[in-house]
A protein has these predicted regions:
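N-terminal beta1-alpha1-beta2 submodule of the flavodoxin-like/Rossmannoid cofactor-binding fold
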Residues: 1-107
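Short, glycine-/small-residue-rich phosphate/pyrophosphate-handling segment
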Residues: 92-93, 107-135
């Protein structure tokens, strides 16, 4: 079994990554393979709402790191999404990733069938619940 963690923090190895690593520690004790993807050093452009993915089950934008991250997500058995909370919402990078992934998944819901998911939010004040529900 393999679990992918995606950290939407702008800071590499920040609190969000630490939270995902805490989840990974428990999973690894059970013999589960884990991999952390940090969006901090990756460019993810926003969705263009072109719906060209409707027939392909893949985003047609190829100029950024989305496809590589999304392919790893699809290949995994489990997914942990993590984001800091900015203005009562997930980070801009996580939002861009979720919007693009969301359109593909809405058009092809079978892609996530039988996958286990969890989310974590690094939050100091309000907005944590909103961020977790969005993820």
């Amino acid at each position: 079994m393999k679990v992918i963690g995606i950290s939407g923090s702008a800071r590499k190895n920040g609190n969000t990554s630490l939270l995902i690593q805490a989840v990974f520690k428990e999973l690894e004790q059970q013999g589960i393979d884990t991999e952390l993807i940090q969006l901090s050093d990756k460019e993810i452009v926003p969705c263009k709402a072109c719906f060209a993915c409707k027939g392909k089950a893949a985003c047609v934008i190829k100029s950024d790191a989305f496809a590589t991250c999304f392919d790893k997500l699809l290949a995994a058995d489990g997914i942990v999404l993590g984001s800091p909370v900015y203005s009562a919402d997930v980070s801009a990078k996580m939002k861009a990733f979720l919007e693009r992934a969301g359109v593909i998944i809405a058009c092809h819901p079978h892609l996530l069938r039988h996958k286990i998911g969890a989310c974590v939010a690094a939050v100091r004040r309000g907005g944590g619940l909103t961020a977790v529900v969005i993820q």
